Amino acid sequence: GAGAAAWAAVPPVVVDESHDEARRDHPGYGSQPAYVNNTGRNDLVAARVIHNAETVTFQVECREPITPSTDPTWMWLLLDVDGRRETGWEGYDFMLNRRLADPTITIVEAWQGPGFTWREVGQAPLYLDGASLAVELPRTLLGLTGDPFAVDFKWVDNPVVEGDLMAFLTNGDALPNGRFNYRYRGQ
């Protein structure tokens, strides 16, 4: 299952500071307008990855229960499976959760290019349990057929603007923050 209790014993865990998705409303300096940003929604606080010979599973945990999957730009998972920036959108070869078949099935999209252009290449089960979300992917779908392998990953919630990497810095929440990725090495 996707619940945090089921994942508690799964190392390694990567963490993000909590409360960094807070809504912002502050007066501007002098005659400058107020700075208002209400895009904070799901506070991403931890992530884990596990794999076996057939699948690789990514899990993210939020500080509070995750909002409904019908929310716009909801809980994206971006994957770089080849470590080459030039072969994907900002290096990302796959994107999940931009589109869902239903609340329990995500559409797996591969970068098609140019720009922020994706095409469906498969579907995968989503496991949502309160503040925990997991997705299980066939390794063959991602081209991760041998051992060892490495995959860079990033969770993003509510960047608002599709195709703008800088939105990861200002809108919603990202794990890890900004333009960074985490790397999982499968042995």
List each model region and its residues.
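Order/disorder boundary and secretion-linked terminal/linker segments
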Residues: 1-74, 78-116, 157-187
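Poly-acidic low-complexity segments
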Residues: 20, 80, 127, 137-138
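Ser/Thr/Pro-rich, low-complexity mucin-like regions
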Residues: 128-176
